[in-house]
A protein has these predicted regions:
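N-terminal signal-anchor transmembrane alpha helix
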Residues: 2-28
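Nucleotide and nucleotide-moiety/phosphate-recognizing core
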Residues: 5, 9-10, 54-60, 65-97, ...
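Short, flexible coil/turn micro-motifs enriched in small/turn-prone residues
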Residues: 12, 25, 32-37, 61, ...
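Glycine/serine-rich anion-binding loops at beta->alpha junctions
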Residues: 14-20, 41-42, 65, 69, ...
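Short helix-capping/hinge motifs at transmembrane helix termini and TM-loop junctions
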Residues: 16, 30, 73-77, 100
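Cytosolic, membrane-interface loops and tails of multi-pass inner-membrane proteins
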Residues: 23-54, 103
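Hydrophobic alpha-helical membrane-insertion segments
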Residues: 26-27, 60, 71, 112
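Interfacial segments of multi-pass membrane proteins
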Residues: 47-50, 73-77, 88, 92, ...
Length: 127
């Protein structure tokens, strides 16, 4: 019973990772992003196919979902919980069950999750 909250958190992190803004924004524009451009459901393909505004929205949502999943897990659990949520949200982005296991590459989600773990290091690395 003591591991149940951790299992629930990891499952929720995976489901958060399943949110594919590239696919959803593509649907909003009436385009299947997985069949256009490079076929990848990621920010770069959205930039190529749909333009800058759609790509910025995709990027921000991908970063935010990685950040929020790890931030919540870190506040509720120890470092193990944060690391498991980190892995789950990135895996959920790359292999989303809601979109037939065809997602993006996970770069923006990874950066958001890493930012939640240690944001000063992420800003230093960006310089």
């Amino acid at each position: 019973m003591k591991y149940l909250p951790l299992v629930i958190m990891v499952t929720l992190a995976y489901l958060i990772g399943n949110i594919s803004p590239a696919t959803l924004i593509g649907r909003f524009y009436g385009i299947d992003i997985k069949k256009a451009g490079s076929g990848n459901a990621g920010t770069t393909n959205v930039l190529r196919v749909l333009g800058t505004k759609a790509a910025i929205c995709t990027l921000l949502i991908d970063v935010f979902k990685g950040f929020i999943a790890v931030y919540i897990a870190q506040g509720r659990f120890n470092n193990l919980g944060a690391m498991l949520a980190f892995a789950a949200v990135v895996i959920g982005h790359i292999y989303p069950a809601l979109f037939k296991f065809k997602g993006g590459k996970g770069v923006a989600t990874f950066l958001g999750a890493a930012m939640a773990l240690n944001w000063p290091s992420m800003f230093a690395a960006a310089l």
